[in-house]
Amino acid sequence: MTMSARVRKMALPSNCDLSDVEMICDNVLGCLEDLDSSRVVSRVTSREDVDESTIGDLISLDCVSLETPLFSFLFLGVTLFLFLSLLQQSLVFLLGVFLRLVQLVGHFLLLLMGEQIGVIDKAMSHIPLPEVGQHSQQVQIQHLVERRFGLDVVTAIVVIGDNELFQVVGHQFRVGIMSDGQRSQQSQNSGMNVASSSRGRHQLVPDRPGSQLSSQKLSSLVPLARIAAAEIPCAVQQSLSRLFARSVQNRQVQRPHLDPQRQRNIVGVFGVQHGRAVLLCALGGDLIEKRPNQLVRVVKVLVDKFPRRLPKRLVHLVHLGRGSLVHCRCDRVCQQRGCCHLWHCGGHFFVGLVSWIVDETAACVVFCLFKVVSETQRISSLPRYMHRELNTAGVVWGCGGKHM
């Protein structure tokens, strides 16, 4: 339908004719044609102060202005996300590098500490040891230690495994094999204990660089203070067995095997008080060899049972091979329950737990072996809790009264 037809249908005033309506329609059509974009641009470009580039810029800017907020927010969000991800990865990498450096520094310090201990041991190994074959020499050594430390304990014995007795006398390391129920005989010439076998022979192995001990024997070493005879009286064994059984039963810990009639299963700690030998404590050798962790718990049970009756003075002095004198002075200076001590013998390190135990008759010091570490492995191979205990323990290295 044409425009004129549409106009004819419209209600028109009575004084209007058809020619007037056609003229109005022509004017309207002309105005519509003027609205064409090309004609608008041509008319605008006819002005002197406006060109086509200006109009293009205006049109493009107008289009961009309609899309700028959404595009900007999207671009900024993606950029911020990528930046934070990269920053996080960088921080994690730097933290890992820092922790690795700290670990390397700590490992180096531990190695340095092991080197220092090795140097001390090497220097002490060249110290000339006195001859122990003469009784006068042993008396002189004992008097020397008494004057410098105020002690009357200079030797130690060690019970290993089933029937082997390791004995430290003066400054010499002795190895003897004992049969069941057979006591060690005391030498009248030298004044020292010598372990004899059932076949009537003595096996003496002095401490020298060439003498080596098996790792199985070393793993069960327990240093003890000196006693007059190696055999433990059965009455004392039974008393300690009952005391130990009561303590274990109270805490529901498995009781170790303590046979009063057989010495080979007894590992005891002995001390010297007022010039006489006193049995301090006895434990099962099988328990130390097979279940050391359980023994540590048992020791803690006994310590907790008698926490207050600590002696005013009790000293445990042991000399274990190659001039390495380990001196632990247990008086007011060292009354920490469960402190860890480092022992050394023949190129091996012994880390043990020293605890206080008190019964009705005597004060008890228990040394429990944790681990044997060869000199090549250094201290760094020990578990972390041992490092922590060693740092807080009263470990004194010395030789001839000179502490290191």
UniProtKB/Swiss-Prot annotation:
Q: Where does the record say this protein resides?
A: Peroxisome membrane
Cite a GO CC annotation.
Answer: peroxisomal membrane
Q: Where is this region: Disordered?
A: 180-214
- Biased composition (Polar residues) is annotated at 181-198
* UniProt keyword terms in alphabetical order: Membrane, Peroxisome, Transmembrane, Transmembrane helix
What conditions trigger expression of this protein?
A: By growth on oleic acid.
Record has Manganese as a keyword: no
Membrane-spanning parts: 73-93, 94-114, 149-169, 349-369
Q: Report how it sits in the membrane.
A: Multi-pass membrane protein
* Keyword Transmembrane helix appears in the UniProt entry: yes
What does the UniProt record say this protein does?
Essential for the import of peroxisomal matrix proteins.
Protein name (database record): Peroxisomal biogenesis factor 9
Organism of derivation? Yarrowia lipolytica (strain CLIB 122 / E 150)
Q: Which gene encodes it?
A: PEX9
